[in-house]
Amino acid sequence: MRWLVGGGLLLAMLAFGIGVYHAAGYFKADHVVVHRPNEISGPTLTGTIYVVQSGAVYRFEHGSFTQITSEDGWMQPASGPSGQLVVVRRQNNFSDLYLLSTSGRKLGQLTHNASSASVESNHWSFYPRFTPDAGTYFFASDQKDPYNSYLVDLAIYALDASSGRAVQWTSPNEFTGGDANPVPLRGGGLLYTKYSIDDSFKVHSQIWVQKRQGSAGQALTTSELGCAQPALSPDQKLIAMVCTKGSNLSAELEVASFDSTTLAMGSPATLVGGQMVASPSFSPDGATIAYLAPASPGGHFQLWTVGSSGPASARAITRDLGLDSTSAPVWVGG
């Protein structure tokens, strides 16, 4: 019970801090009205982009947003087979993965993480990604220690779409929150974000790659760069990632060449600096990267695009939304 009390106090402190932050921002600057995406329009982009705001998934095409789900805890959509979407639905004490149509209709529930025994036995699933052949989907999930249920370190799992059998791919470092952002490779390997903790109890993030399930893998970036949230171009020759480089005030969008055969990565180059960048995603032709970032320091997250080859100017697609920064845009053709 002690950890429950401590957790409650921590949440209360966090809520208080967020309230103070927003109150201070209200008096320091003009109060910004956050619109629902379907209340605004934007420039026309090729293809279709899915984004998330306030627990609802929106489809952006031909310069307009359409809400396809209710505001009911939906987050982190990913493209699935036959144009479908696999989406996380987060509830108070667990989350599950669902298969949705492009209009938001439920086609199936892929995980069942709510326990009938106790809240401590519930599980979380996040960051779904299908393999290029759509035969397997990867996701991050926790397997709680029954004697230490407060330990929630996510590992990456692969679930066979036909058999429904899941196998654990990665072994997370304890007390870091675990592994995240799986990106399956055509050759059968896996890119993801791995977190570690040093002797000063500081958590570091690195882009990590594994050739096969259960292997130790290797780091593609140093812990000093603080890189996370990898995204691959459709031809799997470019990696986009977010790197903090030790800063708590900014996160840069970096891009590097990648050889999916040798698993070698080139030196990262900065595409976007001076912003709090999050959740990059490539366009279907690989020429453009969509990402999320505030339009001004402390602001809400907006949708941006930038050319993947650089140097190029970032383009703001929205100005007054409040997009979910943990839900990467899903950019598909059509």
Language model features with spans:
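Sequence signature of WD/YWTD-type beta-propeller architectures
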Residues: 2-334
